[in-house]
Amino acid sequence: MMWAASRYTEAKLDPISAELFKDIDKDTVDFVDNYDSTMKEPTLLPVTFPSVLVNNNTGIAVGMASSICSFNLEEVCRTTIELIRNPDHCVADTLKAPDFAGGAKILYDRAKIEEIYRTGRGSFKLYAKYTYDKSNNCIDITEIPMTSTATSESIIEKVIDRVKAGAIREISDIRDETDKSGLKITIDLKRGTDPDKLMQKLYRLTPLSDSFACNFNVLIAGSPRVMGVKELLNEWIAFRMECVRRRTYFDLKKAKDKLHLLRGLEKILLDIDKAIKIVRNTEEEAEVVPNLMIGFGIDRIQAEYVAEIKLRHLNREYILKRTQDIEELEKLIADLEDILASAAESAR
């Protein structure tokens, strides 16, 4: 069985999506076989920001459940930076409250928020946002709780049911005016109706208000753990530091390998004619590399590299251009080794 052609499965990603996969080709995370062992897939993504707190995550598995509210990306990143600088930083000072992509408003209670941040458990209420159009005597609802499974159509049906049941008498009409500019449910009011009191009634009787129950249950090293926000961010920081360490090792090895090749090329520069003579006078192809090794005191890897150079490139100009990178590579290697030796540099 093969996967579908890319035209059926491809998706256009926003630029920030690149941060999910950044440096994935530099051994930053482990790869395992996919379901049929035909290719490799990452066990985790080397995401450059704490995505677990930026996306609204809810799910149920065997014997466990998870419900993680989303937060503002800028606030999450700022909080993470402050925690790196100061492990005793108060999370609530920079991470004000949950922030849902669909909008709506939260009845803010700092004590409740801090309890959720500390334990990873708790709940809060979300309310639809509205404005009152006095000239047309109507309420425009522009944001609904993202936690609700209700759509604008089902909300309208619920309101109509309440009107028919006699629970709501202040509404003369309700309609869906949602368009490309965004969601909009318009409620026409009867004369003399207080819009704020009506909305309080709608919050009680319809899905225009909802609760979000937090259960920050995540898998850490394959085991489920309920964690507070600070603990979660510290766990992500440790993960990201490991990604940086692995990326640095990858870059360091690549730089050292390249420097090693250029060191061999540098020796050839001392006597290009000798290199050409060795190649020309060698009777069998298999003997070219050993003869270069003997002639210039280089190892097999360096000799293989030199032997693969085209004849037209065996000139002083070409070799000088290549060996000019040696000084930059030495500086890069020193910088990378400093990063590996210093946790502070890795965090930066």
What are these regions (language model features)?
Residues 1, 30-34, 174:
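Conserved catalytic-core motifs characterized by acidic clusters
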Residues 4-7, 11, 15-19, 24-27, ...:
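C-terminal interaction appendages of subunits in large macromolecular complexes
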Residues 26-40:
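Helix-hairpin-helix/helix-loop-helix acidic hairpins
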